[in-house]
Amino acid sequence: MSITEANALADAPGTRNFTINFGPQHPAAHGVLRLVLELDGEVVERVDPHIGLLHRGTEKLIEQKTYLQAIPYFDRLDYVAPMNQEHAFCLAAEKLLGITVPRRGQLIRVLYSEIGRILSHLLNITTQALDVGALTPPLWGFEEREKLMMFYERASGSRMHAAFFRIGGVHQDLPPKLIGDIDIWCDAFPEKLDDLEILLTDNRIFKQRNVDIGVVTLDQAWEWGFSGVMVRGSGAAWDLRRAQPYECYDEMEFDIPIGKNGDCYDRYCIRVEEMRQSVRIMKQCIAKMRAPDGQGPVVIEDNKITPPRRGEMKRSMEALIHHFKLYTEGVHVPPGEVYAAVEAPKGEFGVYLVADGTNKPYKCKIRAPGFAHLQAMDFICKGHLLADVSAILGSLDIVFGEVDR
């Protein structure tokens, strides 16, 4: 049959596009995503993401909890890099309270935020490789992620849902042995990253599956509300750590990698380079924590906001009362509204917090970067082949905890 005959047949009455379900049980669907794809042969005509399968009512639940009890809910949003979400909520509450975190507390926060970034990017680039047919990278990536999760566990007692950040600082100081082990890991990791790059970066098949796939121009990225790697891949050096520095990021030396084509391959390359920059930041944090001015408390020493030390509690009745009040009633945040955002691994993670002067948030609106990225699936995938859908989805880096909340 000639092409002319085939086109005539396609235009004939009675022919229609083919509709298929992608997920929620699909191995490349990254959790509970369901896409309804409308296909013309192998070409994608329309993508309809169905979300809500992991909806837990997080924003409403937070309204019923004290500020301290709200922190663990943030671990369960982007559960690949939990501490980064806690960071945004704590920054919002600290802005309303008008407090500044002690320097050592800031350094620990930055250190663990960068560990979270590597955790997220490692999972993303290795599973993106798996989506396009490479089986080895995930095995190597999970080996490194296991070591990082051990650092999470040694700091907070939990591998994933850490609940380590506190309003005013962090839960507790890091032991010197842990800081030393993180330092040793930072020295060894770039070599592991080189091994991953040898497998993927110049791999002919990997490039064929990613180059010129899912192209997003910079104007389109701004129009769709993209942030993070999705914007940097299109050529804008927009990073909240540099544009609106929080904690001690203004002291850190690091580069912001940007792409020029805005395709899946550029986004992969940026994530690899961001992991190298995260290691640089972690090394600087460790050096600053070991310096004399990096010593001191890790949480603000105000018993109206943070609990007293256990030793003090056993000696002072007043300290015991403070402890009891903080854990039963919680801290009262002055009335006001504030927006605080951090550069999470997936983009700008923001918290819009409204306080009414009580011990519970009046409203906590969560701005998840993955939500804006997922809604553009239809626009990005249109005209691509069915096989490209999983490559595009992988490069968007969607985690459903934060999309559905």
Curated annotation (Swiss-Prot):
Cross-referenced Pfam families: Complex1_49kDa (PF00346)
InterPro entries documented for this protein: NADH_Q_OxRdtase_suD (IPR001135), NADH_UbQ_OxRdtase_49kDa_CS (IPR014029), NDH1_su_D/H (IPR022885), NiFe-Hase_large (IPR029014)
UniProt keyword Translocase present: yes
Keyword NAD applies: yes
Record-level GO cellular component terms: plasma membrane
Domain of life: Bacteria
Mode of membrane association: Peripheral membrane protein
Annotated catalysed reactions: a quinone + NADH + 5 H(+)(in) = a quinol + NAD(+) + 4 H(+)(out)
Record key words, sorted: Cell inner membrane, Cell membrane, Membrane, NAD, Quinone, Translocase, Transport, Ubiquinone
Disulphide-bonded residues: none
Enzymatic class: translocase
EC number: 7.1.1.-
A molecular function GO annotation: NAD binding
Stored Gene3D superfamilies: Cytochrome-c3 Hydrogenase, chain B
Localization terms from the record: Cell inner membrane
Subunit composition and interactions: NDH-1 is composed of 14 different subunits. Subunits NuoB, C, D, E, F, and G constitute the peripheral sector of the complex.
Task performed by this protein: NDH-1 shuttles electrons from NADH, via FMN and iron-sulfur (Fe-S) centers, to quinones in the respiratory chain. The immediate electron acceptor for the enzyme in this species is believed to be ubiquinone. Couples the redox reaction to proton translocation (for every two electrons transferred, four hydrogen ions are translocated across the cytoplasmic membrane), and thus conserves the redox energy in a proton gradient.
Family: Belongs to the complex I 49 kDa subunit family.
Name by which UniProt lists this protein: NADH-quinone oxidoreductase subunit D
Organism: Afipia carboxidovorans (strain ATCC 49405 / DSM 1227 / KCTC 32145 / OM5)
